[in-house]
Regions:
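Terminal amphipathic helices with adjacent charged low-complexity linkers/tails
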Residues: 64, 193-242, 256, 265-268, ...
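Conserved, mostly hydrophobic/aromatic
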Residues: 168, 276, 313, 334, ...
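Amphipathic alpha-helical packing elements
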Residues: 161-173, 561-605
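N-terminal pre-triad scaffold of radical SAM enzymes
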Residues: 30-31, 289-317, 350
């Protein structure tokens, strides 16, 4: 491996091989070490390395003691801790709270390589190992738990993760600019207690003095535990102030102290993103993992070209993590990475994805937000697109065109989420046409999620007629191009606001259109989303209105079964759901029916077969006549015999030609 392309050291032996007798920062991660820009830990570590710091990685340490944390010695400036690319509780448990059997971010997919809530566990072990070292926590797990939050797995409200993880600072969001500033100040020996004015960070204080930012007060931990309406109000404040331009510092009291969450850091500019992705990554799994790490398979030949999402889905945590303001890399930066992939071992000519949170976003949704920030209480796309929406795919189309022309690349696919509602707003159909023609590998996955308008409003999704319009145009483009490509809709059951009757309506639509989804996602209440707030409180934080919530496991199972009505093992639940909703008319033999009744069930009668008319008595056979043409059963044919001496005009003409020698 060429100089400058080594993995970062993961042991004291590797530090010695580099000639290091000290190092500056220890980066602890709950994932196995993959040196690829799709992993946040790697991005942060390589960024610090590019700033001249010596950085070591400690992936998935043994958390039962502090020995692994001491193994490389004490870092000069601090320890940075991340809980992994995926929330650890989602990685470990299904929505039914059953333990998963496979962890894609660990060697060989083996479970048990990290604890539940590793950010808390690791921080406590680091504090045990080195009581005076500065500790900074970050990543998705910490970011979504920066405020007091409802924890689905414990079924209770937990305080901010900063009160459980003995860290000095929390970095939320993507974190590059905040981490770089923290590192700069720690290297200058600034005490962590003075690092209170950095955007994109949170800290705990005994007294809230004068703040650098405008202040917004949220209901405290005790209040949100005791009153669900207070929890909903706190959630709205947290979302409203999550803006790098107009956002305030949010202060939340907790057990006699105060959590202060500064406004988000501004998104990286295009040139900063380009520089970040141009750093030297090996793009490989560390060789210490003999059985590999499955997570590399999805991203090894994929490219991230954007950040942020203004889609506004209430059940998605990305907006609360990356923010709603979209930024993207330059075309040249993305093409350079594509050319790099063509030289990678194992590359077979296929770019698996050119995407991000939403693949077809390349710029902010409107020019106004660059000056004023994102709008409060409004979504750019749902339920109706904003009049100021700037829907333009021209740059993305150019990017994909130029990538297709790179020598060594056979196909370029787009597999990240496509926002079809945004695509339909673009008057230029070039991107849609080229997407269908060049960038789909047999099927396109989109996320309408449901078909009932009230449910879609709670989800923050566009109404279903938008999906139907897209579906028709997609089919038309495939017909015109002579291609047979399928549309795979993602669907969700049991989202707050979705009743059993709503699930029946969705099942009817799927049945009518010949759709039998293989996979259905139950709503998963993860920290930091508006939908999770609705699930816990039964209140929509946007307007404080009451929301129906399916909490009973039996009802959730029935909603899921309705969307998979054709599976034999789901039949009993489907029957029970149809009985409960008074829709037993969907059990029967009519075309509209979801399932047929079984013998002895009091539903629908089989269609009555029409009685066959009695056959007329057979007539005795007549004796065969001496002459005349006869049909199959001896009856005369309709064509009469030709009269003797007569000749048809056609035969007359033929005879005349023969006679005249022609």
């Amino acid at each position: 491996m060429e100089k400058g392309m080594e993995f970062l050291p993961v042991s004291r032996e590797e530090m010695i091989d580099r000639g290091w007798y000290y190092y500056d920062f220890l980066v602890v991660t709950a994932d196995g070490y993959i040196d690829h820009p799709s992993f946040g830990t790697t991005l942060i570590a390589r960024l610090l390395e590019s700033r001249g710091y010596r950085v070591a990685i400690l992936p998935q340490p043994d958390w039962h003691s502090a020995e692994d944390f001491r193994a490389m010695g004490k870092p000069r400036y601090g320890v940075l801790i991340g809980g992994g690319n995926l929330d650890s509780m989602v990685a470990h448990y299904t929505v039914a709270k059953r333990r998963r059997t496979r962890d894609l971010y660990s060697e060989g997919g083996e479970m048990g390589k990290r604890p539940d809530r590793p950010t808390i566990v690791y921080a406590n072990r680091v504090r045990e190992a080195w009581p005076d070292v500065p500790i900074v926590i970050g990543g998705l797990e910490a970011s979504l738990r920066r405020f007091a939050h409802y924890d689905y797995w414990d079924d209770k409200v937990r305080r901010s993760i900063l009160f459980d993880a003995p860290a000095d600072l929390l970095v939320y969001g993507m974190g590059e600019s905040a981490t770089a500033e923290i590192a700069r100040r720690l290297a200058r020996k600034a005490p962590p207690s003075e690092l209170t004015d950095i955007p994109g960070t949170a800290y705990i204080t005994d007294q809230v003095g004068e703040l650098k930012f405008h202040r917004a007060d949220a209901p405290g931990y005790e209040a949100v535990c005791a009153d669900k309406a207070a929890y909903a109000r706190a959630t709205k404040i947290e979302y409203d102030e999550h803006d790098p331009i107009r956002g305030c510092a949010v202060v939340q009291p907790c057990e006699g102290r105060y959590l202060v969450v500064n406004p988000p850091a501004r998104p990286l500019r295009r040139e900063e993103l380009d520089a970040l992705y141009a750093l030297l990554y090996t793009r490989q799994v560390h060789p210490m993992y003999k059985n590999g790490i499955p997570a590399i398979e999805e991203v090894q030949f994929s490219i991230t070209h954007n950040r942020g999402c203004f889609g506004g889905c209430n059940f998605c945590a990305l907006a609360f993590h990356q923010g709603r303001m979209v930024t993207s890399r330059s075309i040249e930066s993305v093409l350079e990475e594509a050319e790099l992939l063509t030289r990678e071992p194992g590359f077979k000519g296929y770019i698996h994805d050119v995407g991000g949170p939403s693949a077809n976003f390349r710029h902010t949704s409107c020019q106004k937000q660059k000056r004023c920030g994102m709008c409060k209480n409004r979504s750019c796309l749902a339920p109706e697109p904003c009049p100021n929406l700037d829907a333009d795919h021209s740059e993305y189309t150019e990017l994909l065109r130029r990538m297709r022309e790179i020598p060594g690349i056979k196909r370029v696919f787009v597999r990240s989420g496509i926002r079809y509602d945004y695509m339909l707003q673009d008057k230029d159909r070039s991107f849609f046409k080229e997407l269908v023609k060049y960038h789909i590998s047999g099927q396109l996955k989109v996320a309408p999620e449901h078909c009932v308008s009230s449910v879609l409003d709670y989800m923050g999704k566009p109404h279903f007629d938008v999906f139907l319009k897209f579906w028709r145009q997609y089919q038309k483009l495939n017909e015109e191009g002579g291609t047979e490509q399928y549309l795979v809709p993602y669907l969700m059951s049991s989202h707050p606001g979705c009743t059993l009757s709503d699930a029946v309506e969705l099942a009817e639509f799927l049945h009518k259109n010949g759709r039998t989804p293989e996979q259905v996602q139950d709503f998963y209440p993860t920290p930091g989303t508006l939908s999770t707030c609705m699930y816990y409180t039964g209140i929509n934080p946007r307007d404080m209105s009451e929301v129906y919530v399916a909490r009973d496991p039996k009802e959730k199972a029935m909603q899921r079964a309705l969307l998979q009505w054709s599976r034999p093992e789901k039949r009993a639940l489907v029957v029970e759901a149809l009985e409960e909703t008074g829709r037993t008319d969907l059990i029967g033999y009519e075309k509209k029916c979801l399932i047929r009744p079984r013998k002895g069930e009091p539903y629908g009668q089989p269609p009555v077969k029409p009685e066959r008319p009695e056959r007329p008595e057979r007539q005795p056979r007549r004796k065969k006549e001496a002459s005349g043409n006869r049909g199959r059963r001896g009856t005369p044919t309709a064509k009469p015999l030709a009269q003797k001496g007569k000749m048809s005009p056609r035969k007359k003409a033929a005879f005349a030609k023969k006679r005249n020698g022609k």
